[in-house]
C-alpha cells in the first residue's frame, strides 16, 4: 500500500510537469472579457442598443425580456466562462441582430487595446449567406474571414448548406465553424433556428461542438417590427 502511494505521488508530479510543458508549447487562448463590472457592461450595452434602435428611426421602449437578455450578455462578457462564443436564438424580429450590431458599435466606441500593441478590439459582422458567397467567389477572402479574432455571424441557417465551385463541393459555414471551434475564436451567432433545428440542419457533430463553443441566450419575446421597437411589459 505504501509503495502504491509513492508511485501515485510520482505519477501525479510527472503528470503536472508534463501538462505545464505542453501548455508552454501551446499556450491557452485568453477569453475576451470586458474589464468592467457586470452592471457597467449592462449599462453600456443598453446605451448601444438604444443608439442602434434610434439609428434605424425606431422608438425604443424597454421590457423584461430585453432586460434579461442584456443581463445574460453582460454577465458572459464580464465573468470567466469556458464558452468562447454566444448564440442568440429565437423568432424573427425580436432583437438578436440588434444586440449583435450594438455590441459591434460598443467595441468601436470603447477602443479597447489588444495586447502587445496590436491595435484595438473590433468584431466583424457578416450575414451567413455572404459566407457562402465568399467561399464560392473569393476563397482567399473566405479563408481570412475564418480566422479573424472576433466574428459575428448574422442569420445562421439562411445560407445554402453547400456550394459548388468547378466541381468541388464546399460546406462554407460548417467548415468555418469547425475551424473557429478548433482555434477557440470569439464568435457571436444569431439565428431563427432552435437548438433542435440546428442539430437537424447541421448534424450532430456541429451541434455538439456548438454546445461546447457557445452560451445560448434565448429570445422568446414577440417581434419588435411593429409601430414601436418594443412595448412595455
Stretch-by-stretch model annotation:
Residues 2-82, 217, 221, 227-233:
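A short, basic N-terminal segment
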Residues 105-121:
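Post-Walker A helix-loop "phosphate-sensing" segment adjacent to the P-loop in P-loop NTPases
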Amino acid at each position: 500500500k505504501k509503495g502504491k502511494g509513492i508511485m501515485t505521488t510520482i505519477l501525479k508530479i510527472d503528470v503536472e510537469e508534463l501538462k505545464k510543458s505542453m501548455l508552454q508549447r501551446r499556450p491557452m487562448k485568453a477569453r475576451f472579457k470586458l474589464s468592467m463590472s457586470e452592471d457597467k457592461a449592462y449599462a453600456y450595452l443598453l446605451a448601444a442598443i438604444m443608439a442602434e434602435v434610434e439609428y434605424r428611426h425606431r422608438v425604443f421602449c424597454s421590457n423584461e425580456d430585453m432586460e434579461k437578455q442584456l443581463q445574460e450578455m453582460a454577465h458572459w462578457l464580464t465573468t470567466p466562462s469556458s464558452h468562447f462564443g454566444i448564440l442568440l436564438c429565437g423568432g424573427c424580429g425580436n432583437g438578436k441582430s440588434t444586440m449583435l450590431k450594438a455590441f459591434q458599435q460598443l467595441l468601436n466606441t470603447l477602443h479597447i487595446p489588444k495586447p502587445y500593441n496590436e491595435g484595438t478590439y473590433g468584431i466583424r459582422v457578416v450575414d451567413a449567406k455572404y459566407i457562402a458567397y465568399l467561399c464560392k467567389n473569393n476563397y482567399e477572402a473566405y479563408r481570412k474571414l475564418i480566422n479573424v479574432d472576433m466574428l459575428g455571424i448574422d442569420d445562421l441557417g439562411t445560407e445554402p448548406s453547400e456550394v459548388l465551385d468547378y466541381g468541388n463541393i464546399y460546406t462554407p459555414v460548417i467548415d468555418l465553424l469547425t475551424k473557429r471551434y478548433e482555434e477557440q475564436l470569439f464568435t457571436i451567432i444569431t439565428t431563427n433556428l432552435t437548438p433542435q433545428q440546428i442539430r437537424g440542419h447541421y448534424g450532430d457533430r456541429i451541434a455538439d461542438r456548438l454546445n461546447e463553443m457557445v452560451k445560448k441566450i434565448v429570445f422568446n419575446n414577440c417581434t419588435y417590427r411593429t409601430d414601436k421597437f418594443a412595448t412595455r411589459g
